Each structure stands twice: as structure tokens, then as C-alpha cells.
């Protein structure tokens, strides 16, 4: 498959979000260390950023080239690479906060770190999907349905980031070490996998995308985010008396459970009541428009020098 020319605005915006968030994470890592250790950390993060930028230089261009197509393969690669590197840096920042090193007592810096992640991570996902660049999604209803499903993905990402932020925002932690590690790496795994599942559903549907048939991500997020997040927060409140539990996101997960249950029931009813050809009508491409201009009349050939006259019509003879 030959990709079209890359969208320069999309490439620049994606690179700006990725490298901007990486630069802020590097600033946190350097600021949390002091003395000769700071110089070593600065050298390490600079070398890592140069290597990451070399890889990003090619992957971001490929993502910008496929943004107007129905495929999102390079977008999944870029997302996996970004979250993999970002969460490694975030883990060391989290460990430095636990060790109460320099700058760890500043609550504003912790809140700013959470704000940075909550803007850049869901924002990059929506950039990689690039719904506004999908010119093959022509109907307004289908576009808004797809936008609503992508909004649920962004909410799940915010939910996972909130669970991670509850580990470093308070000055003291009430959870044991094993519970903190389990929470961090569970969210890390879901941040890697779940957006790639959503992007793969968009890519597998192709140009004749049907949002009502994209059921893999809702099932996975229902089990891994909505149910597990409610149980984990309830266990933290009941067992460890953790006051950092977000009641707002608990309510969000309860609403998501009810909404997705209704969606699954409606989908089963549609499959049962309508035959497969009726469901596949929406997948058919629109018929090509015919040219409304009538063809020109054929020329009348006659001897030169005489005007072209229409031959008189003859009445049929009655026999």
C-alpha cells in the first residue's frame, strides 16, 4: 500500500505534544536530583531524548501519511512507543517522590504533573485517531456516534491516570508497597493496550466503518477499567482507609457500567430482530452519481451546400 503525502500540520502537532510532555518529564527528573547525580541524570535523559527523536522522526511522518486513510497501524506503533517511554520516566519520578527528595514536598508540582498527563495522554490519542481527517465518514450521525465512542476511551484514560496520580499526589501513602506497585503497573499495562485496541477497531473497519459494530473495546474496558476500578477503590477505602479515592470517578464507572450494559442489550436485540443483510446495508458504499447532462444529438449528414432540414414525418397508412 502506497501512502499519500503526509499531513504536515498533523505531524507538527503530534511531535509538539510528544516532545513537549517528554521535556517536562525530563525537567522533573533533573530537578529531583542534586549534586553530581543531577549531571548524570541530565546526560542520560538527553541521550534518551535524542534516540527517541530519531525514531519519532520517521514514525510521526508515517502517521501523518496514513491520517487520511482508513488504517491506523503506525498510530498504534507511535502510541505504544510513547506510553512505554513516558511511563518509565513517570515511574522514576514516582519513586523520587516516595523517597522525599528535593522538590518532593511541593504539592503544586505534583498537581502540575497530573495536569500535564491528563491533557497530553488523551489529547495524543484523539490526535492519532484524527476523526476530522476521516473524509470517508460522510454522514453526520455516524461521525458523532464515533466521536462519542472515542470520548469514552478518553474518559477511561483519565480514570487510569487518576488511579496512578493517587500514588504521588498526597505527601504520605497509606497503601503497602505491593499494592502501590500493583496499581501502577496495572494502569501502565492498560494504558499501553486499551488505546491500541480502539485504534485497531478503527483500522479493521476500513472505509465502511460502522461504530455500532465496534464492540471489542467496550467489552475490554468494562471488565478491566469499570469493574476493576470500582473494586480497587472500594478495597482501598475498606481495607487501607485510603482517603485519596476519587468519588467522582467511582460515579463515572457506575454510570459506565449501566450505559454499556444497555448498549450490549440493544446490540443483541438488533442482531436478533434484523437479518444480516439488513444490518449490512449501512456498510455498502453510496451509489455513484450519474451525469445529468444529456448527450449531444448525433450530427445530420447531408450533401454539401444544402441546409440540413428535418425529414417530414409520414403518417401510417390505414390498411
Curated annotation (Swiss-Prot):
Pfam families: CECR6_TMEM121 (PF14997). Residues 277-319 are annotated as: Disordered. Belongs to the TMEM121 family. This is Transmembrane protein 121. The chain crosses the membrane at residues 10-30, 43-63, 74-94, 112-132, 150-170, 174-194, 214-234. Highly expressed in heart and detected in pancreas, liver and skeletal muscle. PANTHER family: TRANSMEMBRANE PROTEIN 121. It is a multi-pass membrane protein. It comes from the Eukaryota. May play a role in MAPK signaling. Keywords: Membrane, Transmembrane, Transmembrane helix. Its main location: membrane. Residues 277-306 have a biased composition (Pro residues). It is found in: Membrane. InterPro entries: CECR6/TMEM121 (IPR032776), TMEM121 (IPR042314). Disulfide bonds: none annotated. GO terms for cellular component: membrane.
Amino acid at each position: 500500500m502506497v501512502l499519500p503525502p503526509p499531513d504536515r500540520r498533523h505531524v507538527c502537532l503530534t511531535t509538539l505534544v510528544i516532545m513537549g510532555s517528554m521535556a517536562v518529564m525530563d525537567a522533573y527528573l533533573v530537578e529531583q536530583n542534586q549534586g553530581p547525580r543531577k549531571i548524570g541524570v541530565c546526560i542520560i535523559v538527553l541521550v534518551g531524548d535524542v534516540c527517541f527523536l530519531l525514531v519519532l522522526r520517521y514514525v510521526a511522518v508515517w502517521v501523518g501519511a496514513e491520517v487520511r486513510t482508513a488504517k491506523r497501524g503506525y498510530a498504534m506503533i507511535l502510541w505504544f512507543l510513547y506510553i512505554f517511554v513516558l511511563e518509565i520516566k513517570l515511574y522514576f519520578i514516582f519513586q523520587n517522590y516516595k523517597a522525599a527528595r528535593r522538590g518532593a514536598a511541593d504539592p503544586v508540582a505534583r498537581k502540575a504533573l497530573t495536569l500535564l498527563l491528563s491533557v497530553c495522554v488523551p489529547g495524543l490519542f484523539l490526535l492519532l485517531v484524527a476523526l476530522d481527517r476521516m473524509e470517508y465518514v460522510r454522514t453526520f450521525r455516524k461521525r458523532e456516534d464515533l466521536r462519542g465512542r472515542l470520548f469514552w476511551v478518553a474518559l477511561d484514560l483519565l480514570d487510569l491516570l487518576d488511579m496512578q496520580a493517587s500514588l504521588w499526589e498526597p505527601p504520605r501513602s497509606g497503601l503497602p508497597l505491593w499494592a502501590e506497585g500493583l496499581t501502577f503497573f496495572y494502569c501502565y499495562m492498560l494504558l499501553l493496550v486499551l488505546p491500541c485496541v480502539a485504534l485497531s477497531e478503527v483500522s479493521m473497519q476500513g472505509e465502511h466503518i460502522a461504530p455500532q459494530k465496534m464492540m471489542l473495546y467496550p467489552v475490554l474496558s468494562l471488565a478491566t477499567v469499570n469493574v476493576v476500578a470500582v473494586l480497587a477503590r472500594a478495597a482501598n477505602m475498606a481495607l487501607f482507609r485510603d482517603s485519596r479515592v476519587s468519588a467522582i470517578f467511582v460515579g463515572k464507572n457506575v454510570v459506565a457500567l449501566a450505559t454499556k450494559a444497555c448498549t450490549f442489550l440493544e446490540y443483541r436485540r438488533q442482531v436478533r430482530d434484523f437479518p444480516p443483510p439488513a444490518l449490512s446495508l449501512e456498510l455498502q458504499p453510496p451509489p455513484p452519481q450519474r451525469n445529468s447532462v444529456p448527450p449531444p444529438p448525433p450530427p445530420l449528414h447531408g450533401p454539401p451546400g444544402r441546409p440540413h432540414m428535418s425529414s417530414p414525418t409520414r403518417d401510417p397508412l390505414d390498411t
